Amino acid sequence: MLYPAITEAIRHNKRICLATPRADVVQELYPRLKEVFPNTEMEALYGGTGGDRTGVGQLIIATTHQLIRYQNAFDLLIIDELDAFPFHHDPLLHQFAVRSAKKYATKIYLTATPRPKQKRLIESNKLKAIFVPIRFHGYPLPVPRLRLELGLKRKISQNKMLHSLEAFLDSHDPKRQWLLFVPTIQLLTPFAKLLEEKGLDLATVHADDPKRKEKITAYREGKINVLITTTILERGVTFPSIDVVMIDAGHDVFDEAAIVQIAGRAGRSPKDPTGDVLLIHQGKTEAMIQAVKQIKRMNQKGKAL
């Protein structure tokens, strides 16, 4: 979707920055863009990249924190995952972004889940928006299935297997990969133990995991069948053929945007465009209801195209 704009900017010898809040996304985008634009001077900037980065390439792929390096530098500034943490919550990062662009720069903001502020700007015609309700492969977004688990929190506290998760395992193709989202770091190990007892090949991952990159790579290469994760993998990573299960979907950490993003991890491949999304909960929340409505609404708009 961005390639035409980047291609045009490169053709006119303009400087481009594709910024995103998360280092994982920078690491994923850089090789893809390098393959598409092999003759363009390009650099990836994120925390821990070392002192050998000059930051002077024509095309910069960077975390939004790295924009502090620049002032009046870019003719085209693209902010991916506009609503993601930490960019969404930090006014200083917004200032860095504005300062990094030239006065008459073109700015493109990308998000699948605009926040109320962006929605108001769009509705009042203060922010031009193009709505893309369908994926590149033309198939609808997977609609989450909601499953009530009575005594969910009690079972979690007692490290007991959930009936809904057991039913999922019984019906699930054991060769098929899936992601298990839990609301807190503290739940990673208990659920890992429960699933290891079922003989599953798995790993856990969270934001401060020093082996996060290696585990994600192993999962992408099919060496791990199940990845148990916090919301760190709710966005910005692409796995071709997976299903998704969310534990305690009514937890505060799973707001409407998070649920939509997590559901969006499934069905990303044209060879496997459906995917299963299961939300295990102790009671429906407004976030769950609105997320399902939003996904169905997007699918309806996609059908109309």
Where do the PLM segments sit?
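Loop/turn-to-beta-strand initiation segments
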Residues: 14-15, 41, 55-59, 73-76, ...
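Conserved strand-helix element at the start of the C-terminal RecA-like helicase core
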Residues: 9, 14-29, 158, 162, ...
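Motif I (Walker A/P-loop) of helicase-class P-loop NTPases
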Residues: 1-6
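Conserved RecA-like helicase motor core of SF1/SF2 enzymes
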Residues: 81-86, 209, 216, 220-225, ...
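Conserved helicase ATPase core of P-loop NTP-dependent helicases/translocases
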Residues: 41-56, 202-230
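Post-DEXD/H (motif II) to motif III coupling segment of the RecA-like Helicase ATP-binding lobe
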Residues: 72-150, 160-163
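Conserved segment of the helicase C-terminal RecA-like domain
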Residues: 101-117, 263-294
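Conserved nucleic-acid-binding Ia/Ib motif block in the N-terminal RecA-like helicase ATPase lobe
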Residues: 14-16, 20-64, 202
